[in-house]
Amino acid sequence: MIVSNRINQMFEEMKTWRQELHSIPEIGLEEYETSKYIKSKLSEFNIEFKDGYANTGIVARVKGSQGESDKSIGLRADFDALPMPEKNEFKHKSTNEGMMHACGHDGHTSMLLGAAKYLSENNDFDGSVYFIFQPGEE
């Protein structure tokens, strides 16, 4: 399957993830629900991960099927929100008073989950890809 076709097929799913993440913004190093959400998706995709970095951070890994080389690359997304009220009116607006995803971290996290899912399904490469979900970036 051509990469762009599969990514296009995943678009609505990634959009749903972004909206779900948008509705549960958390700040600082206390992104417990967001971390739980990310870990549930990684588990759903059968991707191994370690958690607890800086409290709520996660590092996942997808190993390629073409050998056991030590080649690796890391992809990162931040997942914290900002301490500000959301004034938008749509179904996925913030459910956490005084917190909002106002700078795209919900989108960053959704895209990284999409990359992780895609590469776990299409692991015809050598080495490993690490997915770093970073809390408390703001």
Q: What spans do the regions from the language model cover?
A:
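Divalent metal-dependent hydrolysis catalytic cores, especially in the metallo-beta-lactamase
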Residues: 128-138
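Acidic/His- and Gly-rich active-site-bordering loop/insert found
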Residues: 1-101, 110-113, 117-126, 130
